[in-house]
Amino acid sequence: MNHSLKPWNTFGIDHNAQHIVCAEDEQQLLNAWQYATAEGQPVLILGEGSNVLFLEDYRGTVIINRIKGIEIHDEPDAWYLHVGAGENWHRLVKYTLQEGMPGLENLALIPGCVGSSPIQNIGAYGVELQRVCAYVDSVELATGKQVRLTAKECRFGYRDSIFKHEYQDRFAIVAVGLRLPKEWQPVLTYGDLTRLDPTTVTPQQVFNAVCHMRTTKLPDPKVNGNAGSFFKNPVVSAETAKALLSQFPTAPNYPQADGSVKLAAGWLIDQCQLKGMQIGGAAVHRQQALVLINEDNAKSEDVVQLAHHVRQKVGEKFNVWLEPEVRFIGASGEVSAVETIS
């Protein structure tokens, strides 16, 4: 139990694992999983650890997925990319722009690996992965069987996919297929992007604006450990939203296609005057209330207590109960984040 997980999670929480293995191809990943499983150990497959909170020491093997490679197929209507799960997401965004293949610019600077992107259906500034995903290649861990799911079969939802449900723990993502249409259409619905002129804007300008918004609002994990947005933006019924807006008319709200309404968790937290609030070594970030940071050698229990406090305060004021976006990892695998902080 002496392999530190601190370098393998962006929160910088110091817990240990029994074994840590880096897998650079599918076979190494399968071998590591099968060996650990035969020993009766739990196994956790990790990308860059940018969306996890380790609650305690992990009693098993952590496999770091470092399967690399980018293949490009140039078709008349679009560029098709086949990207290894271990590639860094932001580096991929930069690479596609440099190569004149726009479409990912709204998703710039999202931390983590390409293989993690479908699990959460990552999204930012009006674009989600499902907009550009063609397929996801995974491997069934017990049999080594390769499975390709179309974007539809991935059952993407808000920060959700089949990989959080039926496919969790049984399959490992090894590659993601992306489709970037040659007829580029900017998405300028959020934040500073609304100020850009859709008739003249370039992909590089969108990329620059997104990077500027993220770097000014979000803490650098190398300075203050964090896992990005700690909570999901709550999606509520139209009735709930109407009641809330009659009391708080300035509350940011985003009507969804199905009639529900997405609220801004950061705004709700901010209204409770929680920016800068600290418990132990964990704090609510002063610029972006949606982010909890490791201010000073935080322990996982500091983060859990702080998240509980934030959830309670928002729930009491707005009757909206936040759910963590970050995944909570216990001694033998993922546990319910909502139950942990309730």
Curated annotation (Swiss-Prot):
Enzyme class at the top of the EC tree:
oxidoreductase
Cofactors? FAD
> What EC number(s) would the UniProt record show?
1.3.1.98
Q: Its GO biological process terms?
A: cell division; cell wall organization; peptidoglycan biosynthetic process; regulation of cell shape
Q: In which pathway does it act?
A: Cell wall biogenesis; peptidoglycan biosynthesis
Domain FAD-binding PCMH-type residue range list: 13-183
Which molecular-function annotations from GO does this UniProt entry contain?
A: FAD binding; flavin adenine dinucleotide binding; UDP-N-acetylmuramate dehydrogenase activity
Q: Name one GO cellular component term.
A: cytoplasm
> Sorted alphabetically, which InterPro entries does this protein's record hold?
FAD-bd_PCMH (IPR016166), FAD-bd_PCMH-like_sf (IPR036318), FAD-bd_PCMH_sub1 (IPR016167), FAD-bd_PCMH_sub2 (IPR016169), MurB (IPR003170), MurB_C (IPR011601), MurB_C_sf (IPR036635), Oxid_FAD_bind_N (IPR006094)
**Which PROSITE patterns has this protein been placed in?**
FAD_PCMH
Substrates-to-products reaction catalysed: UDP-N-acetyl-alpha-D-muramate + NADP(+) = UDP-N-acetyl-3-O-(1-carboxyvinyl)-alpha-D-glucosamine + NADPH + H(+)
Which SUPFAM superfamilies does the entry link to? Answer: FAD-binding/transporter-associated domain-like, Uridine diphospho-N-Acetylenolpyruvylglucosamine reductase, MurB, C-terminal domain
Q: Which UniProt keywords apply?
A: Cell cycle, Cell division, Cell shape, Cell wall biogenesis/degradation, Cytoplasm, FAD, Flavoprotein, NADP, Oxidoreductase, Peptidoglycan synthesis
Ribosomal protein among keywords: no
The residues the entry assigns to the signal sequence are: none
The active-site annotation reads: R159, S229, E325
| Residues that coordinate or bind substrate | Y190
Tell me the compartments it is located in.
Cytoplasm
Keyword NADP: yes or no? yes
Please explain the role this protein plays, according to its UniProt record. Cell wall formation.
Q: Which family does it belong to?
A: Belongs to the MurB family.
Q: How does the annotation summarize its subunit structure?
A: Monomer.
Tell me the protein's name: UDP-N-acetylenolpyruvoylglucosamine reductase
Species of the source: Escherichia coli (strain K12)
